Every structure is written in structure tokens, then in C-alpha cells.
């Protein structure tokens, strides 16, 4: 989520180029994280592919529709997504969602489409939407939902970036460099998460999201 503000503020990329670049980088780095979860047995591929396919359709359409939406509207939507992610992190996992037996696959796939649409349009992963959908409609335990969501997000990000490529220019060398740096960073983050309390990390990241969201709003409208 924080990659887009960096691309906008530090690298000064145009809004739609930043969103397209973010999706490509996310597709690559999420695959790396997904492989680690898969080796630990936390990825249910059948469920992930079913959700991911409907999400890909929505994400590709979202990427195409972004061509007709003004950058300020897209940034406003991205800010809302950041704030929603921050709220979800602050809430934590107070309520454990019990996986449903006989989960409604068809309903889950229907949910995947609008989730992908929003993610593809705004250049974000939408993990805070995917994980609950996998637990409620996919019948997965929380640990499996988190791992499987990485597969869904990777599929959505790939499709969304293809949708953006029809109307946005992307520097593939920059994508490769950012993906490499973030892949290494994710490994460091995994080590850090084992040494620092999860609740503290959630609050810290949520505060960072809120601060960056406010900064983006100020830059966009003032």
C-alpha cells in the first residue's frame, strides 16, 4: 500500500503510471511471499485459484476503467483504501471467524469480482477484503486464508497491471528493481515480525498508513 505514495512523492511518477507500476511490483513480490507460505502448507490452491480467477476478471476491468477516471478521483479512492486498511489493522483479530462448512463457492466467486475491480482500479492488493472473504465464503482457517490471499492478490495484481498497460507507460527496469528490493525487504520483515510483538507492528503500520493518507489528501486537494 505504501509503494504508491513513494512512487508519487519520491519518484514523481504520474498517478496512473504509479498505480500500474505498483500492481506489477506487487504481483512479483506477492508470489515470493506466497511460495514461503505454500511451503508451510498455508496455501489452498484450489480455493485460491477459484477466487483469483473471478478477481482477475474484475481487476483487469478495473485497470481498463481507470483510463476514464481522473487522477484525483483515483487518489481519493486509494486514500480511502489506506484508511480502511489502517482501521482493520487497529482492530486486529479480536473476533476469530470460524470457517463455514459447505462454504458457498459461487458466492465467494461473486465477491471476488468486485474485490478485484476495486484492487485493479486503485492499484492495491485489497488483502483486508480478500482474507475475510476466504474465511467466510471459502471455509478456510485464518492461517490458510492469509497464505491463500497472497495467491489471489498476485493473480489480481497481474490482471490489473495488464488492464493498465493499455493506457499507461511502465518502466519495466524500475519494476524489476523495486520488486527485488521489496522481496529482500519482505524477508527482513519476516525476521522482524518474530522479534517484535505483532500488536505493536500493527499499530505502528496503521499509524503510518493514516499519516501518509493525510499527506496524500493535502497534496491532492490543497
Report residues per predicted region.
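Juxtamembrane transmembrane-helix boundary motif
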Residues: 2-10, 15-16, 35-121, 136-137, ...
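Helix-turn-helix DNA-binding module
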Residues: 133
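Transmembrane alpha-helices of multi-pass small-molecule transport proteins
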Residues: 21-36
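Short hydrophobic/aromatic, small-residue-rich stretches within specific transmembrane helices
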Residues: 22-26, 52, 149-153, 174-175, ...
Amino acid at each position: 500500500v505504501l509503494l504508491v505514495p513513494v512512487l508519487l512523492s519520491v519518484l514523481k511518477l504520474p498517478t496512473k503510471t504509479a498505480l500500474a507500476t505498483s500492481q506489477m511490483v506487487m504481483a512479483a513480490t506477492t508470489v515470493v511471499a506466497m511460495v514461503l507460505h505454500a511451503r508451510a502448507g498455508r496455501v489452498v490452491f484450489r480455493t485460491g485459484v477459484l477466487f483469483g480467477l473471478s478477481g482477475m476478471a474484475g481487476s483487469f476491468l478495473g485497470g481498463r476503467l481507470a483510463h476514464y477516471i481522473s487522477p484525483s478521483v483515483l487518489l481519493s479512492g486509494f486514500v480511502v483504501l489506506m484508511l480502511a486498511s489502517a482501521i482493520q489493522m487497529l482492530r486486529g483479530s479480536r473476533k476469530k471467524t470460524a470457517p463455514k462448512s459447505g462454504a458457498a463457492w459461487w458466492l465467494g466467486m461473486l465477491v471476488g469480482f468486485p474485490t478485484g475491480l476495486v484492487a485493479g482500479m486503485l492499484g492495491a492488493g485489497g488483502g483486508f477484503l480478500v482474507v475475510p472473504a476466504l474465511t467466510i465464503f471459502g471455509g478456510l482457517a485464518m492461517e490458510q486464508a492469509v497464505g491463500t490471499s497472497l495467491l489471489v492478490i498476485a493473480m489480481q495484481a497481474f490482471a490489473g497491471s495488464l488492464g493498465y498497460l493499455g493506457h499507461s507507460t511502465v518502466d519495466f527496469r524500475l519494476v524489476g528493481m523495486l520488486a527485488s528490493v521489496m522481496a529482500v525487504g519482505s524477508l527482513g520483515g519476516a525476521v522482524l515480525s518474530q522479534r517484535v510483538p505483532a500488536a505493536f507492528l500493527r499499530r505502528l503500520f496503521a499509524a503510518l498508513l493514516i499519516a501518509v493518507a493525510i499527506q496524500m489528501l493535502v497534496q491532492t486537494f490543497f
